[in-house]
A protein has these predicted regions:
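Short, exposed "boundary/linker" segments that immediately precede the start
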Residues: 2-3
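Conserved helicase motor core of SF1/SF2 NTP-dependent helicases
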Residues: 7-190
C-alpha cells in the first residue's frame, strides 16, 4: 500500500534529479563474471543501458543520453594535494578546490611493494605485510582515525584478521565514512 502511494506521488513529479559522479570508481566486476554476463547480454540482446556491469548512473546516461548534466565543481572534503591529483587525472582541472593546505607533511604517499606476482584471488598477503609492518608503524598514530580501503572483499577479510584495530572495508562500503588517514590496498599487481 505504501509503495502504491510512493509510485503515485513520484508520477506526479515534473522533474527528477539524480545525483552522482561518472568519474567515481565503477562497479567491481571480475573478468570472469564480465565474460559470462556478456554472453547472457548478447544472447538476450540486452542493451548497454540495462547491463548490471554498469553503475546505476552510467545506465541512466546510456538510456537517456541527452539528459542535462551538471558538474558540482566545488570540492570541500579532501586535502588540496589529494584532490588536485584527482582533479588533474580525472576531471581535466575542472574542480574548484575549496580546502586549504596547512603545510602538513606526507599528505599523499605511494608505497610500491617488491615486484612480483603477489595477487591471488583478489588477495595480496604481500600488501598486508607492508601495511602492517611498514606503513602503520611509520604513518599511523591514531588507529581509530585510520581506515584501509580495497576493491576486494577477500582482501578486506584478510586485513581484518591481521589488523584488528583499524577499520578495513571495500571502497564501496567505506564510501561516506570520514577518517583522517586512509590506506589504499590496490591488491592487483598492475
Amino acid at each position: 500500500r505504501s509503495t502504491q502511494g510512493y509510485s503515485s506521488a513520484a508520477s506526479d513529479v515534473y522533474k527528477r534529479q539524480i545525483v552522482g559522479d561518472t568519474k567515481q570508481l565503477p562497479n567491481v566486476v571480475t573478468d570472469d563474471i564480465k565474460a559470462k554476463a556478456k554472453a547472457i547480454f548478447d544472447r538476450f540482446n540486452v542493451s548497454e543501458g540495462y547491463q548490471y556491469t554498469n553503475s546505476f548512473l552510467q545506465s541512466i546516461l546510456d538510456v537517456m543520453p541527452n539528459v542535462t548534466q551538471t558538474l558540482l565543481r566545488e570540492h570541500y572534503r579532501c586535502h588540496p594535494k589529494i584532490i588536485n591529483f584527482c582533479n588533474q587525472k580525472f576531471y581535466r582541472g575542472e574542480l574548484i578546490i575549496m580546502t586549504t593546505d596547512k603545510g602538513e607533511e606526507d599528505v599523499l604517499s605511494v608505497v610500491k611493494t617488491v615486484a612480483g606476482n603477489h595477487e591471488r584471488n583478489h588477495y595480496s598477503q604481500r600488501q598486508i605485510d607492508v601495511i602492517k609492518n611498514e606503513i602503520i608503524p611509520k604513518y599511523v598514530s591514531n588507529p581509530e582515525e585510520t581506515g584501509i580501503i580495497t576493491p576486494y572483499k577477500n582482501q578486506v577479510e584478510a586485513l581484518s584478521k591481521e589488523i584488528t584495530d583499524i577499520d578495513a572495508a571495500t571502497v564501496h562500503k567505506f564510501q561516506g565514512k570520514e577518517k583522517e588517514n586512509i590506506i589504499i590496498s590496490t591488491v592487483d599487481d598492475e
